[in-house]
Amino acid sequence: MARDMTPVLKRCRSLDLDPIYLGIDKKSNRNARSGRKLSEYGMQLKEKQKAKFIYGVLEKPFRNYYAKAQKLKYGTTGENLMILLELRLDNVMFRLGYGRTRKEARQIVDHKHVLVNGKPVNIPSYQLKAGDVIEIKEKFKGAQRYKDILEVTGSRMVPAWLEADHENLKGTVTQVPTRAEIDVPVNEVLIVELYSKSLSKPKRRVLECLNLTDRELKLRKFLKIRNMDVL
């Protein structure tokens, strides 16, 4: 899997992002750059990069989240995008205080320390829903690692849409969060504008074709050879 190897604080500076949103309580000693004025596209791109960086999501899965957000029948695309990102298992672990950073929470999930509704889940992007119960496996509950984590995160405020039981290393998604309850400094409207422009009609048609069966693709190729309209 591809990773962004840019130092975290350097990346935060380039995105004008306070590291506290990543769970990092320190700032770079370097002076902030007096950045040049961004174009409309530059601002849109920056917001997308910021959201991807905060949640640790690469371009392809991020685009998939956007496509899923578009298909939801309720809410706006931008708000739905943020809610889908917020309900990732690794993010919820971070919000509950079972990871000092989302990166650490992701590692804990990867290492099969987590149960969701009593069943082991090791997929950081696993999508949670209202009523789901998250718990650290019993055999890991006494580990020094979690004592050290809670020493740092125990004083953090847990979002209203979550219920944390730090004593038993459990947590519950009591409801789906609203956009107002998601404290990330991202302007999702600009992200929607960016994707709306990039997914022009020809590109949308290409994406639709990618979902066709082999038989349909062969038929389209056959018609195209004979200069027939295939769209």
Where are these regions (language model features)?
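Ferredoxin-like alpha/beta domains used as RNA- or RNAP-binding modules
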Residues: 1-96, 123-227
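Short, well-ordered loop/turn sites that connect or cap secondary structure elements
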Residues: 108-109, 128
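Beta-rich strand-turn-strand
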Residues: 99-102
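The C-terminal cap of the DNA-recognition helix in HTH/winged-HTH DNA-binding domains
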Residues: 95, 110-111
